[in-house]
Amino acid sequence: MGSNDPEPVNLCVWWKQFKDPTLDTLVEKAFANNFDLLQAFERIRQVRAYYNIQTANLFPSLDFNGTFSRYATSQNLFDSPFLGPRIQNLFQLGFDVNWEIDLFGRLRNLKAAAQADLIATKDDYISLMVTVLADVARNYTLYRAFEKKGENLKRQIQVKKTINDLNRSLAKSGLESWDLFYLTRAQIRALEAKVPPLQMQMEYAVNRLAVLTGEQPEFFTIKGEGDILKARGLIPLNIPSKLLQRRPDIRKKERELAAATHRTAAAVADFFPTFSLSGSYGWEASRFFKWFRPESSSWDITPGLALPLINFGRIQSQVQIKAAEQKEVFYAYQAVVLKALEEVENNLFTYMQQQGRIATLELEYKDFLENQALALSRFTSGLSPLVEALNQEWNYLNVEYEWIEANQVLSESLIALYKSLGGEWECFGTL
């Protein structure tokens, strides 16, 4: 690795490379309190429980039951001494066993499909987490950029007002025409018109950060001072060679495809017979004290067979449905892969172009700064009026505004790039 190469970025905590403690705190709050993430975590618990059900279906079920009944027979219907006393008791206690023998893999495929659904749900959670954390970083970037733009506009307005006062004085004394005065005043109003939209955008960014971190917007504030995020020279390595391993939405589609494949196999298994085995063992007696005697025991074993014969194409249609769903998921998987590659290429291209733009703006800013220093030197020497120095100051403030905006776009493109890479899903541990 050359000396000018960027350091490898840990995609687990990519936002820490900005070295902004306020951003780190906001990310931690979002990770712990975001309601969309909390909902997604509960969906994992639901799907895990369903997977446990499908796993349990592979094994026999054992039930315990016990009953007591007392009944009287009708003398009109059963008037016979061979039936025993008219009023009788029946004590029953025992165990029932039921088991579907999965010879053709129906239950095994349903279990495998449920397992794939569980993994897909976990990847969906990670995908949402990546989106939420990227939204936090993006809105924080917007907030800091709007903050710096507002400060720059105040300075521009202040300089323009000073220039306007000088133009008024010169026009009143007849040394200049009123054209410059009205032009400068129009420029001041144009600058002042930019302030309300900027304040609205700042408020929107703050409110969005409040929602992302699980707080009420009216009580949410960003504490501490900060600068616009520095994103120059920060680029992750291995792009896009490991993209397919990192993006949770691609992994999710892979698991959904696996689940659809197993459900198709389970539907095909319905063409074949279903074997079952049931049995029971227990004790039955008419007297309580005879309940657990050896002669009171009873048992039965019942093998079962069910084979579909005539269903007018229901099973075949069900197989066709599952096969079509499987192909649909396959096409969705291919679309997600292409979209992921497109996002990475677009964000990477934007990032590289913005770096070039910022480098040019910095050279322009440096030239205007030197020009302003020369104009100020000429003014102090009595070689040029103050308005010339002020105009040069406004020029470099205007370039500074563009530089802030370019850095904002650069940070947004870098955040979008990390989002499109999907992070390191292994960092999130076992869900």
Language model segments and positions:
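Bacterial Sec-pathway N-terminal export signals of envelope proteins
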Residues: 1-50, 147, 175, 228-258, ...
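Small/polar, glycine/serine/threonine/aspartate-rich low-complexity segments that form flexible
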Residues: 1-19, 28, 66-96, 219-236, ...
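Sec/SRP-type N-terminal targeting helices
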Residues: 38-39, 55, 101-129, 179, ...
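Transmembrane beta-barrel architecture of outer-membrane proteins
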Residues: 23-25, 46, 90-92, 138, ...
